[in-house]
Amino acid sequence: MNYQMITTDDALASLCEAVRAFPAIALDTEFVRTRTYYPQLGLIQLFDGEHLALIDPLGITDWSPLKAILRDPSITKFLHAGSEDLEVFLNVFGELPQPLIDTQILAAFCGRPMSWGFASMVEEYSGVTLDKSESRTDWLARPLTERQCEYAAADVWYLLPITAKLMVETEASGWLPAALDECRLMQMRRQEVVAPEDAWRDITNAWQLRTRQLACLQLLADWRLRKARERDLAVNFVVREEHLWSVARYMPGSLGELDSLGLSGSEIRFHGKTLLALVEKAQTLPEDALPQPMLNLMDMPGYRKAFKAIKSLITDVSETHKISAELLASRRQINQLLNWHWKLKPQNNLPELISGWRGELMAEALHNLLQEYPQ
């Protein structure tokens, strides 16, 4: 593999000009995310069939040539298991590569495992066993070693030739339109951003709290998410989730009480007064400003029967259409559908099981089934 290390704006512009002559590119990123809220970009890998490039973001100030490539509709971008890479692109460039196809999704429609790893795919299609020893390396450290660079370059060097085979295979299976729809769904999921005022809904065991405690949790979770984004710090490095829940549950009135709830010294030192102020604010809210009690999906009287009935329907659809039941519906998607049906959580879009390619296969049957399970 003869790769080119791109470390300057001029080199990036020259590379992108050359890439424009090709109809498809393989992309990958290397990043670090240990304590930060946002992934920290360490490297971008690109291969168009002729130019194999490692783009070092630490030396680039003008990203406009690459952004133009990413949004060029005449160049298809291929990634493998690219959901986290998409988050990197959104964070760095404010947009996603378009059009985009994920080879892990293509492979799933061709009967491969749902989470088929890149190394397994390369071994099957190319007969090459990849060295994955650098997968946990520090991609922000400089200089990068030759071994690191070769590891990174291999991710796109082997990916691009495989894409053509997978596209043919998926099209022959008759599932290519559905696979492309699933790629669009992956992008849509990645672009969903939690509003701080809704962050409390994602706190484990929030449903166990009463209304004023929920109001307190709403204030605490809103503050924590804003602080995490502002400081680029993972939310649990601001205040741990279980500690946030405990503060909402017991609504302490002193730093000593925070300590007795098990909060760490640093949590109390840096945020103790803020937490107490938010508790006090929740204490003074009028009754009509309190949120409605949360209902736990799994405690709904018909949940187990409804879940089992949906699973049975999915098995039937899977066998009829000769497609993996695991690909057709996950536990998360079934729960999303039931949350929507029983109006337990606000949702901006139709549940995934009754929209897109899945909806074409089973929306009508699911709607009929759900009528048997009113709230």
Swiss-Prot record:
InterPro entries: 3'-5'_exonuclease_dom, HRDC-like_sf, HRDC_dom, HRDC_dom_sf, RNase_D, RNase_D-like, RNAseD_HRDC_C, RNaseH-like_sf. Pfam families: DNA_pol_A_exo1, HRDC, RNAseD_HRDC_C. It is found in: Cytoplasm. GO terms for biological process: tRNA 3'-end processing. Its cofactor is a divalent metal cation. Keywords: Cytoplasm, Exonuclease, Hydrolase, Nuclease, tRNA processing. Its main location: cytoplasm. Residues 210-289 form the HRDC domain. GO terms for molecular function: 3'-5'-RNA exonuclease activity; nucleic acid binding; nucleotide binding; ribonuclease D activity. PANTHER family: RIBONUCLEASE D. Exonuclease involved in the 3' processing of various precursor tRNAs. Initiates hydrolysis at the 3'-terminus of an RNA molecule and releases 5'-mononucleotides. Belongs to the RNase D family. HAMAP family: RNase_D. This is Ribonuclease D.
